[in-house]
Structure formats: structure tokens, C-alpha cells
Amino acid sequence: MRKVGITLSVVALVIMGFVAGCIGGTQTQGEKVKVAVLFDVGGRGDLSFNDMAYLGAERAKKELGVEVEYMTPKSREDMVPLLKQLAESKEYDLLVLIGFLWTTPLDQVADQYPDQKFALIDSTTGKVRENEVDILFREQEAAALIGVIASGMAYELGGDTIGAVAGMDIPPLWKFHIGYLYGAKYFEKKTGKPVKLLWQYTGTFTDTQVGYTTGMQLLQQGAKVLYGLAGLTHVGMFDAVIDWNKQGKGKALAIGQDASQEWYAPEYIPISGAKRVDVAVYTAIEMVVKNQWKGGIMTLGLKEGGVGYWNLDGVRQFAEFAQEGGKLKDMTPEDVVRIVKEQREKYIKPEVWEIVRELEEKIKNGEIKFKTPQSHDEYEQIIKELEKGNLDAALEKE
């Protein structure tokens, strides 16, 4: 994979709480590492999380010379049997598990196969094992920036309401919710302009029709900007925004997430949040290839380049991927970049970018550190306080 542009500096990784010992011996020189990447039940084609994982693994194939196989369970009930089957085969040096839904299956299986290496992306079992690496993201940090941007866009569209179409009610989405609302309230504090947030869980990452219906409902409730946080489901949300505009019901815009999704409809999707699942997958594979495997937990945030928002280089890169895959219709990658640039200039004003840069710097230098809720009750309490304008409720205490 060619280098992808992101608004952040060079990607670095912060490794936290790692176990000192390595497992599984050393890789024999010349022996090809074999990896299985296990998507969640949504599989490829979500234009987001799973597709980003695929790009990271493909980069590893190209740059590290590994062999990669891709698998998607038919249902959640298939996850444990699939893990056991692959571990018992002793065929794979590493099993990379994509997404929160793999958490419980991995926890049930990992101790039974101590010589099998596992990498869990975007979740943690809460256990520190020598054969398990968990890679997490500080989603609040990117979502806070998106919250500022969405709020500014809403006002340019003549409204004060932003929305989000989310997938399942799970910890990674709690963090997105906290960050997005924090950003909206930060914008409110800096500008004096009130912002209302409509947040809706759909319960699915795979149903575009649900995404469409939910998106339409939020637009009918007055949302001017919708943030997609539901994988394939929020592609339906994109379609709702497109139809809303084309049917003359009003002007609205959408924001993508994980991969750069502007190419899908650049006139209506001027920006996407970045969650570098590709970096996480590549890093896990690289640890095996370079005999640097250590069990534990990694976290990636703004400072490490693991989250953020896509710049125009990234927009171009993913438009090229879409073109190569036959998904980019009636335009070129250059057209996508040109339209996105025009839409950003029109709807994201310089004063909004100033607020974004200020908030980004505070996060990167540690002045702002978000809490990670440890329970649903804590998550709900943080949201309630943020809705009151209490920004400190979302932050770690000194």
C-alpha cells in the first residue's frame, strides 16, 4: 500500500503494559510467515473498518512478504469454532481478529492454545497474555475534532443540530459518542453557538437499509450533518443524505469514518474521521515477522497518528483504491479531490479549523486526556454531564 496522507505527523506506536517475554520461538530465516485475518460478521465491502484491515494486511504482504488468508464467520456462533479450528491446525503464525465481537470468543480460546499468537484489533479481553496482543484506539480524540467540524458545518447549512448513526452499543462506540459530543460542546463554548446532538444506535454494522431509515429519521428531526459510525450500515446513511438533498428536502452533509469515504459521494461527504485499523493490523504482523512479539496492550491516538481525519492526500489515495476496485463511478480520483476541496472550503470555515487545531494540540500535548468509561452506567453519566455543558466530566482528573 502506498503511503496514505493523514493530517497527523509520522505514525508512531505507544506500547503500554507489555509482557517482557516472547513466545513461539524465532522465525527461521527464509520461512514465510502465514497469517489469517478474521473479519467480523460484516466482512469485506463495508468501505470502512473491515476494508481498512484488509489494506493493512495487503501492505504486509507486499512489504513484509507474508502469506495472508482472509475469513469471515457466518454468525457470532461460528466465531469460537473457527478460532479453535485455526489454532488446532497449527498452520498460522498469527490470527488477527478484527473488531469487538471477537473479544469473548478469544477470551474463551486463548488459554487453550498458548503457542498460537492472537492479535485483537479495537478491543481487549482485559487479560494480559503472552500469546495475545490487543490494539486499542483512543476514539474520543478523533471524534472530538469531528464534533467541532460537524458543528461548524451545521451552522453553515443554517442549522444547529448534528447527528450520528452508530452501530452496536459497545465500548468503542461509547468513546466515539463521548468525543463527538465533547467536540460539539467545545465548539459551543468557543463560539457561543448552541449545538444539539442526535445520537442513534442501530444495533448492526451490516444493514444498509437500517442505516438509510435511521439517517432519514435524524434528518427529519433537524440534523444537518450525520456522522457514520456503523460500518456497512452507515453506507445506507450516506444514501439517505444524498436522497435528502436530491429530493429537495433541504441541505445536509455526511461524515465518514475509519477509511476516507469521501469518494462515495464527494459533494455530500466533505470529510471522514480516520481510525488507522490498517496500521494496527500491519503492526501486529510486523511484530511476528521481526521476532518482536510481546503480549499486552497497545493504544493509538492523535499523538501516535492512529486516529484523526483524512487530508486530501488520503482522499486521493482511497479514491484510487475505489477506482481500482471498480466502485468509483462517473468521476476520477482527481475529480473527487477537487470536489472535496471545494466543499471543505465552503462548509468548514477558517475559524472552525482554528478551533480544531487548538483542540488537537491540547490533546496531543496531554492537556486534554479523555476518560475511558469502564461501564455502561459510567458512559451514560458522562454523556449526561456533557449535555449540560460540563466538559470536565469527560476528562481524566489531574
From Swiss-Prot:
The modification N-acetylcysteine is found at residue 22. Belongs to the BMP lipoprotein family. PANTHER family: ABC TRANSPORTER GUANOSINE-BINDING PROTEIN NUPN, TRANSCRIPTIONAL ACTIVATOR PROTEIN MED. Keywords: Acetylation, Cell membrane, Lipoprotein, Membrane, Signal. A lipid is attached at residue 22 (S-archaeol cysteine). It is a lipid-anchor. The keyword Acetylation applies. Transmembrane segments: none annotated. One of its GO terms (cellular component) is plasma membrane. It is found in: Cell membrane. It comes from the Archaea. The keyword Chloroplast does not apply. PROSITE patterns: PROKAR_LIPOPROTEIN. Residues 1-21 form the signal peptide. SUPFAM superfamilies: Periplasmic binding protein-like I (SSF53822). This is Uncharacterized lipoprotein PF1695. Pfam families: Bmp. The lineage of its organism: Archaea, Methanobacteriati, Methanobacteriota, Thermococci, Thermococcales.
